[in-house]
């Protein structure tokens, strides 16, 4: 098995596990950003190695698996998820993509609904009788929960109307099962009285109730249901086989009207559903639902906006896991009040000393939050924060806890000023605040254990050398055991040394040594990035490699030489020069370059570099190629790929969900390429995607 096959297999296993935790167990163990990072890595690898992509890859799934305690049901039509946006600009970008794809300038009418926070299910009616119900599962295969669904009072066991006239033999209805707030409160009150553990939120309660093997328990949970779409609609032959799709024969060409038809058949429809004729009306609907969110009898976490005309939906089609004609416009992060019990100081890879607030645990945005970063002294001054203050905490982007403000009216008598350390809290070395920076830094460099650990973690990270078997915890153990002090020391480790580490058996030790051996083969760009030079990210490292071609040329480059590189200004150039001035850094670089190797970068002629000196910025999601593939293709033609838009940018490539970079490009009058435009440009120069 090749290294690429191993990596793809490893990513698939990880993502399958995380899908299982999130969709089946309702116990996610990693943040969304980490999941997205792994999914992007898998998609990129499968894009460049299509022969290794399997039909059961997580990249082809919506998420989750059927529980083994229930029989499995295969959905005739997949139950897809929705893409998300979090801002008005992103919603407008979605509408623009819809209009661009339709390319006929007609007004778009949307069907708008609250985004219910429950569990997606599919109900199958045959000859008007409810004969089967299933969860979404992984989108293709779900759990058979028919017995439990039949206990929900709002779901009809028999459709109203006349079979053959009002509906065909088979009607599949998709919708959301949820637990009303009042039912949730009553359930948890009862659990408390019994000394039992309650549910964290109504969604978990609904999911747990539907997965009861004893339907009598489900019946007591007072679940509810709203229909939101159709699944397969067709005819049964005498032998029971399903025939062609009859949806258009019985249901309207309007999504909204189809919901009304389902309501007439006896299926409940969310009362807040609206038909809207402009983007402005969609935003007003969003604001209205957000304002009345707390007053609704059920939990929601945003709005769903769908192109109403079914024929347009068919023209727009789908991407792998979601329709192009619908979007979930999510609400901002939730906020709660809590108390700052203490402030501790952490030391990062570059010596930055970051204050972290230790909070009285508070439940916000669906999780318990006990820590929040305070960034730097300026942020603390801006907030006017003291230890023991009451603060408003927000989960920014529903991921990162953030202190929004101090509630001065509730400031206690024992509020204490936050005092920054005068020496490093880890190694006790001197600290300094570089001119023009807001961050206090430890001056000890790799002498500081905290910086050593973070530098080695960075070196081994996926974007750098992706050392298989070397996680953050193991790095900390290796440093604490004094087995390594620098990234170069990694390559001196032996299996015997590693196997002495707690919880590291012979197999794990062998895997790590093999992973380090594989990491010796790299690229100059990854080598530079892995050194962890301040403010030298992936794009800048690649630009340095493609500009200077060799490590020696980068080491000896002058300030002026460095500033001739795309994305390198005076500050970054000085950081690079200062890095290579330090003797201990040079020793590490020398040690690494002795054991690591990379292909020579060929110096191409001007004819071979038709995009020389052209600066490109990639934004949004590319569906025909991965970002890495696009970046590599552009760089092979001489282009510089930058991470930010400026007046010097020549082209911005805007994929799906392009955000602020696209807006800035439009403001600056910079040429914008769609993904199709990029594919065409590359094809002009002999690169076929």
From Swiss-Prot:
Entry protein name: DNA ligase
Gene source species: Colwellia psychrerythraea (strain 34H / ATCC BAA-681)
Any one GO CC term of the record: cytosol
Named cofactor requirement(s): Mg(2+); Mn(2+)
Function of the protein: DNA ligase that catalyzes the formation of phosphodiester linkages between 5'-phosphoryl and 3'-hydroxyl groups in double-stranded DNA using NAD as a coenzyme and as the energy source for the reaction. It is essential for DNA replication and repair of damaged DNA.
Keywords: DNA damage, DNA repair, DNA replication, Ligase, Magnesium, Manganese, Metal-binding, NAD, Zinc
InterPro entries, sorted: BRCT_dom (IPR001357), BRCT_dom_sf (IPR036420), DisA/LigA_HHH (IPR041663), DNA_ligase (IPR001679), DNA_ligase_AS (IPR018239), DNA_ligase_CS (IPR033136), DNAligase_adenylation (IPR013839), DNAligase_N (IPR013840)
Protein's GO biological process: DNA repair; DNA replication
Record-linked SUPFAM superfamilies: BRCT domain, DNA ligase/mRNA capping enzyme, catalytic domain, Nucleic acid-binding proteins, RuvA domain 2-like
Molecular function (Gene Ontology), one example: metal ion binding
Span of domain BRCT: 606-689
